[in-house]
Amino acid sequence: MKKGDILEGIVTRVDFPNRGIVEAEIPAEGAGAAKTDGEKAGEAGNTEPAKVTVIVKNTIPGQKLRFSIAKKRGDRLEGRLLETLAASELEKAEDVCPHFGECGGCLYQTMTGKAQLSMKEAQIHRLFRDVCPDLHFEGMFDSPLLQEYRNKMEFTFGDAYKDGPMALGMHRRGSFYDIVTADGCRIVHPDFNKVLSATKDYFEAQGTPFFHRTMHTGYLRHLLVRRAQKTGEMLACLVTTTQMEKEAEEALLAGWKDCLLALPLEGRLAGILHTKNDSVADAVKDEGTEVLSGSPVIHEELLGLTFEITPFSFFQTNSLGAEVLYGKVREYALEQLEEKPEVIFDLYSGTGTIAQILAPVAKKVVGVEIVEEAVLAARKNADLNGLSNCEFIAGDVLKVVDDLAEKPDLIILDPPRDGIHPKAIGKIIAFGVKRIVYVSCKPTSLVRDLEILQNAGYRVERTCCVNMFPSTSGIETVCLLERR
């Protein structure tokens, strides 16, 4: 077995986040290091086909694949998908996005919602099997919307292929440069697609150049669109370089603004913005934003609270799914408490959403977040909601916890994808709280941290997941831990 060899096989399962486990057979004479029954295939007397397991990403259980060996590290093999020879029995979904297969955004649109939930639940059980063998798993709660659920999209300007026409949308699957014009995207409200199409058509008609990421020349970079699920308020933010004369730019942007204001939208376009970004990185960066029309913010409602959102705010991208998630966090935090907690720590608090949801049931909530802009937003939203018992501190949890005067009765953990710093988790354990609620968007990081917490005397009492991002690999997990 060597790199470049081409095999066929069946996907037996998919491990989190998108690692298809493929069983393939190869002729004994070509097996090389592949083992079968303790013996290397190809040795004298072995004429049976060898079975080999290969990881092929972005696949679905039950699919028959043709793939090439891309990496070989000892007994570990990774393949690159060449062709799907036969669909899986799980692929029975109707009304599939027209961009599925090209666009790199969704993996599982051809699977039914029920099949997606079953697959993700199985992934969680496999991950937790060794760390929590007696796991009390309460199930995978679905997003209230399986389509049109996202409240934010960052579309990229580029070419559909090298030296091809301008496109505006998502990166083509497996490509850093090619862009798919995702004007029929199914995971956003149709208003998003109207803004995208109008923007692309307008700048195409004007002959405006897009930013070439290799040559670092051009004007158009990104289109950021937000739409609140509850209020219907929308923001459209055009991100460009400064590679245009001021007078020409003002006329160009005025025409774009008028184009959007004339659109027949179901929601209300509350603000049209222009952001400058001359950084080399292919990421949205705010180097100065001006309001072309309306307001620089929109408002969204979650569990009876109101949140102000800018184009660049960190806010859960599925508002209705966030209500399910945060509802479970609140349930776990307050379950069977004899009295309300005096002090709650919300560590890695982001824009303070969880802290504010729990504020009515505590004397004080202290949020700690390393991103200063998020802390400022949290303070502003707490004022907006009339919550005077929330304190938000900007800083690294690893350092800030050393200076916190209060002793918490309850700790909420909602860290970034990679989990909690090993030194920080030791300091969190040292508070000795009876109850911790851990919220995670990456279960592989979660199980690593749970092992540390369990070794320190905590026990996982309840666990559930929320399918926050249907048709993608994303899973949100909530764990209730109590000190033994």
Task: Describe every region a protein language model picked out.
Residues 224-228, 233-246:
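Carbohydrate-binding surface patches
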Residues 1-95, 99, 173, 391, ...:
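Terminal RNA-binding accessory module
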Residues 20-26, 169-172, 237-239, 378:
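Short, acidic/hydrophobic/Gly-rich beta-strand patch recurrent on exposed beta strands
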Residues 62, 188, 318:
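Short, conserved phosphate/pyrophosphate- and ester-handling motifs at nucleotide-, phospho-/glycolipid
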Residues 139-146, 213, 222, 226, ...:
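Short, solvent-exposed loop/turn elements at beta->coil junctions and helix N-caps
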Residues 85-95, 101-210, 230:
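Extended interfacial segments that mediate partner engagement and assembly in macromolecular machines
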Residues 2-3, 8, 13-16, 25-26, ...:
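Rossmann-like S-adenosyl-L-methionine
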Residues 177-221, 242-273:
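Internal alpha/beta scaffold segment
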